[in-house]
Amino acid sequence: MPKQEWKMEYDSPALVWDDALPLGNGRLGAMVYGHTGIERIQLNEDSLWSSGPMERNNRASLGMLPTIQKKVLEGKMQEAEDLISQYMFAAPYSMPRYECLGELDLALNQHTSFTSSWTPHSLDIDSYKGSLDLMKGVYTLTHSQDGVTYTREMFISYPAQVLCLRLRSDKPGAINLDIQMDRQKYSDQKSLDDRQPGVVKRGGGWAAVLLQENHTVGGNTILIGGETAGIRYASAARVTCDGELLDPYTMLRAQGASEVCIYLAAATSNREKDPKGCLLYTSDAADAL
């Protein structure tokens, strides 16, 4: 099969979650919509659950299994089903819920970026070409506006364990990029639906993992984190650029740049004793490459 047939190409951004393009390395994942004005990238880390490991084995199941098998072979299906309902379910019946990690939000050349009612959207542009190389796992978006061509490249490295994003312009100093991270605090509140940008919905009846930290660190890193039910999690986005990097504490702004790079790492206490320390070390290592 020709190599180009392993590449998915698009002439417009995704409007719903099902159409967004997935990136991942088996542990860290992202869903990319491809908006050119304000972009929201949904993030996942496979060990982020609503609680830690738990023992749910039903200790009575094994002893009752021969009896149930005998009932089935005798054709006594109702009796077998009754025993199954009594002896074969986990204890407790419910299990921890998988939780999304959060979002990485990018606003390119916006006068007002992340207002209280912002939604992901694309600019009035001259050209648009998005692609996902299925063999390399690299997403590329190229668009032109006002005589400037912008190129965004993204992939998630397995060796470095970070999401890597690079935004370039073909004209010097044409990039003014606002970067923030966020996470829905409670799923039972009205909030933006990540699957349908711009749509406000009401979630389920339980709280999501609490976001207790959302601020910059060291003038070049955005950190989010929280703890609930004994599970600690954190994610950090390290930002470098060839322009000026401003630090308003709640976000970072790359101003007058021709190239911006972001390295995003994440960790939880389901896998690491010190998630925050682990991901900051990972960010330092990626930044040094």
Question: Model-predicted segments: where are they?
Answer:
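A short, hydrophobic C-terminal helix/tail in secreted or cell-surface proteins
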Residues: 284-289
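Aromatic-residue-lined binding/catalytic grooves and analogous aromatic/hydrophobic interfacial grooves
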Residues: 1-283
